[in-house]
Amino acid sequence: MKVLKSIYKVMGCAILAASLSSCVNDWLDVAPSDGTDADAALTSSADLDAARTGMYKALKGNSSLVDYYGQQFFVYGDVHAGDDYQYNNIGGSNRASFYYDMNYQTASEFTSSTSSSNVAWKSPYIVIGRANRIIAAAEGGALSDAAEAKATIDQYAAEAKVLRALAHFDLVRIYGKPYTEDQGASLGVPLVTGVLESNAKPARSTVAEVYTQVVKDLTEAISSNALATETEPGYVSVWGAKAILSRVYLNMGDYANALSVAEDIIKNSGAALWTRDQYFKAWDASTPNESEFLFRLNVAGSTDNNVLNGIGNLQQREGYKEMVATKKFVDMLTSDPEDVRNDMFLPATAAQEVATYGTNKVYLNKLRGQGGNLRNVTIVPIIRLSEVYLTAAECAFRKNDKTKAVEYLNDLVKNRTTTEASLATVDNITLERILIERRKELIGEGQRYFDALRNNETITRYTSEADKGWHKTLSKEAQSFDRDYFKAIAAIPQAEINANPNIKQNTGYGE
């Protein structure tokens, strides 16, 4: 496999510039942008610390690797749905149009090459590769200070298991069918938990096998008691790991476990929902309110992906302005004028856009740059406490505990609006109401598309000219589709298939 062979070979290719030209797929072996060596031998806890830095940097990406949390994962998770957050047909420059238009037919159209990436593939496997090296070194017992630095070494290994789980989880949601569709029986992605030989050609594991490993990694990391108990921006703590685990269980349809983990976080983490008065300022990159962030990336300085291709610059009105809220979403949110989340959007200012959007607030303003610099977006959310409350509400409802569902839903709603009618009661709470609240809260955070797939929703951009809103003319299939449509899951990049014939392509895609 083109990517995996390069990641997991055993020191077969050094990262030194002098040797890069001799390496197959040597882009995978470049040092993190802070200069730490991502693939040098790990002989001490100090080496492990440098490798840890490289692992987190792979999660964030840089100007040349934008296929994960640096950019494309958020685009995929929101704009592929396109019912709440759409490509900006007027002011955009096609950086977020690929999955919105859905004009692709062949696997060759899917690429993870540098800044033109339209798929999340390279960077997640880089994260996995670097996590595997940390785990192997930490558990191998050969580090020079293994005894005196045991607590630090154990923590880094636990963090690596969490990030390995997260990367596999994100990959399988993109390239595999939803777990809830066939209980994971269909093909997922290559599952890699250790060093492979340079000529290895791993096949795709099933979705269920991938999820089993994801849960195993997360539960082992949590039960190790090695993860930090206090949340630190940029690094995963035990509460961040539990929040990810709750999200995983939710995507599996394991509502009992998802609820149990969510309630543990709500009751014991010490995290607190932002109040209505805090909400807008909480996203301020200069002075963020950390009380809701269970795991966020800390993007800092010119070494991280805060440049033109970062997700913040794609979303912002003064940036590339690639995405806008759909008319349906704007109508849904503004139906409650007291909802503070209305303040998270800005109106268009360019004349051509104003002609279409009018005074409606369409530009999401969550990821605003520090000091007004759009390239200095320091807050990149992975998971927040508000999502945990919404998970708890949904799972309680699905377990027929409406009282508890109302409690968790209203805990969130009363911190977003002063409108009493927006609060749920045992008599009027529905699953749809909970899912709508989830859409309002998490827009732009890369979860809408996956929620629609796991719930077997029909994703409807529009069905006629009457409800077309601000959408451009799309193919009939792109106007409205569900998870049975073959384009609902991405094609594995053709370059990977060419390098590894053991990888079977997703149905419907030619070369």
Where are these regions (language model features)?
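Membrane-proximal, proline-rich intrinsically disordered regions
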Residues: 3, 23-80, 281-283, 311, ...
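Extended ligand-binding clefts on enzyme/binding-domain cores
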Residues: 45, 50-52, 60-69, 209, ...
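Short, surface-exposed recognition loops and adjoining beta-strand edges that mediate ligand/DNA contacts
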Residues: 36-42, 66-88, 171, 176-185, ...
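Conserved, well-structured interaction surfaces
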Residues: 94-175, 223-227, 375-380, 395-399, ...
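Sec-dependent bacterial lipoprotein signal peptides
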Residues: 1-21
